[in-house]
Amino acid sequence: MTLRDRLAPALAGLSAACFLSLGGVALASETPVPAIAASAAFAEAKAHLAKDFDRTVADIITLTEIPAPPFQEAERAKAYLAMLEAHGLTQTTTDAEGNVMGLRRGAGPAGGPLVVVSAHLDTVFPADTDVTVRREGTRLMAPGIGDDTRSLATLLAFIRAMDAAGLVTEQDILFLGTVGEEGQGDLRGVRHFFTEGPYRDRVSAFFSFDGSDPTRVVTGAVGSKRYRTFFRGPGGHSYGAFGLVNPMAAMARATAQLYEIELPPSPRTTYSASVTGGGVSVNSIPAEVYTEYDMRSESPEALARLEAQLLAIFQESVAAENAARSTAQGPITVEPLVIGDRPAGSTDPDSGLVRSVVAAIEAAGYSASLSASSTDSNIPMSLGVPAITMGSGGSGGRAHALDEWIDVEPVENVRGMGVGLLAILAVAGVR
C-alpha cells in the first residue's frame, strides 16, 4: 500500500470543498476558514497572540542568540526541545538526524493522520558569527533572525494561543524543528523525517514556516542537482611539460559548453558554474582542478534532462582534451560528485490545503501569491504529500546577510501570525 493510499481518507477531507478562481489564485467559496475565523475560540486565540507577543519576541531573541551553523544545530535544537516540552507537548524527542519534535494530540484516534507544522533550526552562518540581537525601534537585527528563527518562536506562540482558547483539533499536530534546510544541508532533516521517521506514514498535510511574508505561499518545489566535479591529469611544469594534457582546459571547455545549452522559458530551469579551484602554482600544469555546478528546475523531468546533458558534456570535454594534447604521462579523467540533490515537485493549487491557506490569507485582508522555491516542502511535495511553505508573519529583510532584520511592530505581526494559525486549524479540523 502506498503512502497516498494510507492517507486517502485525510486527503479526501482536504479536497472536499468547492472553490472559485480569480486572478490566477484559487479563492475559497466553501472552506472551514470562515466559520473558524468567526468563532469565539479563534478570536480568543488571536487575542492571546497579541497579549502574549512580548513573550514571542523574547523567544525570538533567545533562539537567535544560540548559534546554529550548518551541521552544528545541536545546541539550538536542545533549547528548542526544552521549549516544546515546557509547552506540554507529548512524545517530545530528538531523532537520529537531529530534528526535534513534539505532539499536540487531537480528538482523533491515536496513530491516525496528523498535520506537521515545521520551521528549520539551522542558519547559513558559520560558528564564529556574532549573533547578538540589536534593536532599533521595532526592528530586531541579527544573522538568522528572520530565516528562520522567528518562525521557530511563532510555532510556540501558536501552541500557547490554541491552549489559551481551549482549541481541540480533529487531527494531531506535530510541531517540528528541522536541521539541514540551508545550503549543503541538502534538506537532510526533513528528508530523514519522511524516509526514516516514525511519523512518515501519518502525515496528511505539511506546513513549513520559513521567512516572514504571510501572503507568499510556496506550492512549487524548485528541485536542484549540484556537482563538485574534479578533472585530473598528470600535471607538470608549465614550460618543460608543455604539450601534455591539461585538466584546466577540459574543465573550461565543459563549463563553456554548459553555457551553450538553450533552455525553454517554461518550466523555469537554470544552471550555474559557481565555485572553482585547484592547481598548485602559476608555473605548473595542474594535476587536479574542480568546479561546482548548480542546476535547478520546477520540473523533475527538465532537471533530469539538464543533468544528463551536463554529464555528457563532462565526458565530451575530457575526450576532446585527450585528443588535442599528449597523453604520454597519462590522460585526463573526470569525477563528478553529487553534493546536492533536492527533488522537484508541487502541491496542486486546487488542493484543499492550498485553498484553505489562501482563504486564511484573504480572511486577514491580504492577497495571496503562489510561488515556487526550494524549502523543506520539497521533500513531501516530491512524495505526493500535500505541503506548502509560508511566512510566519510580519516583515523582514536582508536574509542571509549579517544585517538581517525583522520588524516586531505588534499589530501587523499578530495579523500575519493569525493567518498561519487559522490555516493550521482549518486543515487539522476543529472539534
Where do the protein language model's features map onto the residues?
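Bacterial N-terminal signal peptides that target proteins for export
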Residues: 2-14
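Bacterial N-terminal signal peptides
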Residues: 12-23
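N-terminal hydrophobic or amphipathic helices/low-complexity stretches enriched
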Residues: 27-69, 219-223
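Metal-dependent amide/peptide-bond hydrolase catalytic core
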Residues: 29-40, 44, 248-431
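A non-catalytic alpha/beta surface segment that caps or lines the substrate-entry region
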Residues: 59-113
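Catalytic-core environment of secreted peptidases
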Residues: 103-150
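Glycine/charged-rich beta-loop-alpha catalytic/anionic-binding loops adjacent to active sites
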Residues: 131-142, 232-236, 399-405
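Acidic/histidine-rich catalytic neighborhood of metal-dependent amide-processing enzymes
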Residues: 139, 144-222, 264
